[in-house]
């Protein structure tokens, strides 16, 4: 009887292992589906869809590699003579096909960026950059970065941490990223983190971009700012204005040019960056420092929120109205219409003089962004581009999810190359005196 019990036990273990293989394969396939399929209006579940699709897609090479190792190890240990293995292998093969489609689009991002830059700036825009600075630009893909997607530090960068720019405790601090090589009057890149205006930290986002640009000779600044719901909007925008003022007053000590600042950010940070570019010296957001110049020389906005009011009805069933009213502005549109309007970048486009003084902009948006809908960003670009005095570059990336460039991946690599080209072009334009 003991022998029979042992046989039954082995059969149970075998069945469990067989089922485990199928379950892992099913989960892998579901994750791949979230990466390639655009799903948005599903309530709060959209956050889970975004997160799984984002991680799976941008780490697709790692996912495929680990799954291949898993299948190979299973074959060596458990064999292939089961129905469960056949089903599981079918699911894995489907997963790899979907991730291969995703990778194809990610690897094509370089061509998308190139077309967007040339359409907006001209075919020969790189020739406007000095030979010395052009040598810093690359269009190569660096596979070494994909091997370590979360390794950001570079030997040519030193850090000055936790400098206060306003009296808001830890939320009023910023970090300065400085090239190790000595220099002065370097271009400045000011990073504003995202996080739905409620979460986020100066050390968490845009690390690939900051390190790439600082290593090539820029000075980077990354800020904290007050968060909702403790601080209602527009406190976040006021802090961005204060940070710009701090940079203009202090960045020369770190080798930066106080007269040249490009502000960048993604999501809520992209929203604040666009507002910074469209509202220089807006008195309502500069109480106590009304006479400070808060103009910037460029805006690099990724998947930015462009409308707090859903004025065009694009979102339909997935309106942000309740979230904005309860958590961010903490007043309804009826109670505070001016705050909603002023807080919507799209509302500034047709105000007198705004399009004429807006700096060059580079807006990047993914078609499969679950949190910021591509149709809203398209509408913003379509409204501003024809009337803007300065060039507006818009790159729309197939299958790209929210926060796609947060760590190293093939698509992030293409983005860094394109951002470097554009930033150097804006800097060259400024040096020629073509913008204030």
Please describe what each predicted stretch is.
Residues 14-436:
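Alpha/beta-hydrolase superfamily serine-hydrolase fold, recognizing
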């Amino acid at each position: 009887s003991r022998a029979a019990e042992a046989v039954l036990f082995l059969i149970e273990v075998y069945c469990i292992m067989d089922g485990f293989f199928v379950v892992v394969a099913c989960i892998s396939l579901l994750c791949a589906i979230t990466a390639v399929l655009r799903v948005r209006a599903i309530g709060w579940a959209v956050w889970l869809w975004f997160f799984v699709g984002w991680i799976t897609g941008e780490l697709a090479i790692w996912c495929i590699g680990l799954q291949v190792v898993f299948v190979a190890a299973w074959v060596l240990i458990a064999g292939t003579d089961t129905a469960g293995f056949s089903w599981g292998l079918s699911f894995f093969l489907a997963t790899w096909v979907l991730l291969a489609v995703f990778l194809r689009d990610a690897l094509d991002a370089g061509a998308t960026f190139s077309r967007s830059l040339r359409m907006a700036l001209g075919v020969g825009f790189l020739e406007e950059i000095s030979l010395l600075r052009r040598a810093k630009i690359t269009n190569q893909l660096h596979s070494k970065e994909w091997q370590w997607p979360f390794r950001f530090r570079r030997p040519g960068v030193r850090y000055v941490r936790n400098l206060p720019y306003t009296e808001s405790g830890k939320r009023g601090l910023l970090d300065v990223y400085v090239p190790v090589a000595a220099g002065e009057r370097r271009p400045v890149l000011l990073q504003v983190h995202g996080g739905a205006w409620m979460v986020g930290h100066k050390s968490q986002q845009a690390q690939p971009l900051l390190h790439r640009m600082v290593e090539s000779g820029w000075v980077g600044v990354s800020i904290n700012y007050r968060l909702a719901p403790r601080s209602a909007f527009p406190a976040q925008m006021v802090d961005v204005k204060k940070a710009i003022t701090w940079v203009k007053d202090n960045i020369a000590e770190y080798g930066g040019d106080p007269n040249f600042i490009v502000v960048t950010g993604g999501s809520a940070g992209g929203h604040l960056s666009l507002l910074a570019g469209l509202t220089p010296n807006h008195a309502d957001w500069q109480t106590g420092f009304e006479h400070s110049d808060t103009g910037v020389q460029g805006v690099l906005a990724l998947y930015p929120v462009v409308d707090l009011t859903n004025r065009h009805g694009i979102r339909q069933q997935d309106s942000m109205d309740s979230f904005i009213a309860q958590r961010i502005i903490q007043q309804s549109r009826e109670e505070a219409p001016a705050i909603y309007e002023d807080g919507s970048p799209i509302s500034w486009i047709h105000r007198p003089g705004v399009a004429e003084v807006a700096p060059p902009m580079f807006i990047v948006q993914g078609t499969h962004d679950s949190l910021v809908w591509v149709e809203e960003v398209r509408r913003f670009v379509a409204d501003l581009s024809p009337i803007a005095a300065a060039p507006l570059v818009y790159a729309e990336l197939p299958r790209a999810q929210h926060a796609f460039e947060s760590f190293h991946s093939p698509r992030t690599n293409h983005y860094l190359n394109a951002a470097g080209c554009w930033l150097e072009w804006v800097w060259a334009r400024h040096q020629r005196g073509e913008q204030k």
